Amino acid sequence: MAMEKDLLLTCDAGTTGCKCTVFDARGEAVCSVRRSYPTSYPRPNWSEQDPQLIVEAVFGCIRELLQQVSPQRIACVGLDGTMNGCIPVDENGTVLHPNIIHSDTRTEKQVNEIAGVISQKDFYRLTGNRIDTHYTLPKILWIKENLPEVYRKTRWWLNTKDYLYGRLTGRFGYTDYSDASLTIALDINNRRWATELLQDLGVDAQRMPRLLAGHDVKGRITRDVYHATGLITGTPVAIGGGDGACTARGAGVYLPGSGYTYIGSSAWVSQITPAPVFDEEARIFNYLDMDGVSYHVCGTVQCGAAAFDWTLKNLLGGDDGMMEISRVENMARQIKPGAEGVLFLPTLMGSRTPYWDANTRGALMGFTLYHDQRHIARAIYEGIAFALNSCAEIMTECGAPIRSMMLTGGGARSGLWPDMLASIYGLETRVHKSPGETTSLGAAIAAGVGVGMFKTYEEAAGVVASRSSHPVNPVWQEAYAKYYPLYKGIYQQIKPTIDGIAALGL
């Protein structure tokens, strides 16, 4: 008797490693396996990964998972991965150069070349994004100019999960709408490649991958993959989406005004909208959802929990190295909102939303001999929360206020951030039931829609649950209404000094 195909298997290809998870039809994680892989930094500002090592890690995870569940129960495989990458492959899917990943910023020259062809304003209206070094299009230009033989042989420009899709199914040259958007080579208004822009830049639009919705099931597991992993030949594979799009779906976001906050090494605030949300100052950005219909509007804090971790290690560690997070939270709770005047600007890796200034440095200010580690701890939490609020505030200014908020990512495990964010946002904030599984759950939802386990993304949102709800604290809210404007003023006050430091080549 054949087993019921009642499970979904997801492959999440992240920056530091991959995680493969099996979900049931209720959105519950049945089992999960992680493996790491390296990032190389061959020169300053360069960040690369070997796609083959990612595939080996994913295949290894799948083999381990299938020791715990029968492969005959897997109804579909769903994928997600880091966005903004650049993997050139030939017509056979052979990798021609390591993946130039999202954190690579070698392309200042190419960014200026794009800006010479189209104004920043027109580019933003066309693609929903700024011209910036983190995205794929400048990386394609860099390869064209510096590795002409690689460019000549390239048939497709892929992101991480697109390459993985090709290796699983034998079908290379596909991407979904979310990853396509953050190549910054897509006309997001018309949902097609920006062929005129590409032509003006001398880039062959025919080498951009074909567009699929994340739930489209056009590929199936090959016999070679069966031998490598144990997945049954012919098992459907949904291409899924970029990690940002999958996180939104895994957070249950599908209605306008319903948003989420993600706190990981970086952090962001996002919501799904029926149309792009444009800001006159281009402080927020847009990309298509993996469904190919809806849009995500997003504001990103470049250094989220990474700023918190740096502070723990370097300012709050004492003689024994990094202080326990629970102890830091207890310290921070002893201090009133506003940290009695201590303020923190968490721009330790430059800034995206709202300043978009790569030279920006972090700042900790307002302390005196009276203040101690408890004030610093409180200020760090508040600085990151204030930075996230600036993202939500811009959306409100643009006519797209968030009315409900889900918190996810590693920061959602904090006992302090949910209360703090609720009072700073002025919005009841829920914490995701499984904050570490949100992105993978989004990939599972796409796969489930693809094989009919869920009729629609909206129906699938019903499997998303929260574990706690945090109301606005009126006393905290009143205090933050006084301190947030002071926080917002820091950047402009210190910018001349920051620019002076940058002029020294530091």
Q: Where do the model's predicted regions map?
A:
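N-terminal glycine/serine-rich phosphate-binding loop of ATP-dependent small-molecule kinases
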Residues: 1-97, 125, 153, 226-227, ...
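Active-site core segments that coordinate phosphate-bearing ligands/cofactors
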Residues: 2, 8-10, 108, 115-129, ...
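Short, function-defining helix-loop hinge/capping sites that tune catalysis or transport
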Residues: 20, 58, 88, 98, ...
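Residue-level signal for inorganic ion chemistry
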Residues: 27, 50, 77, 104, ...
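Short, acidic/turn-prone active-site loops that include or flank metal/cofactor-
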Residues: 35, 40, 100-107, 180, ...
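Short beta-strand-loop/turn "lid" adjacent to the catalytic site in phosphate-handling enzymes
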Residues: 63-102, 130-136, 165-187, 210-213, ...
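Extracytoplasmic/secreted proteins and extracellular or luminal domains
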Residues: 67-70, 204, 398
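A conserved helix-loop-beta module that forms one wall/lid of the active-site cleft
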Residues: 201-213
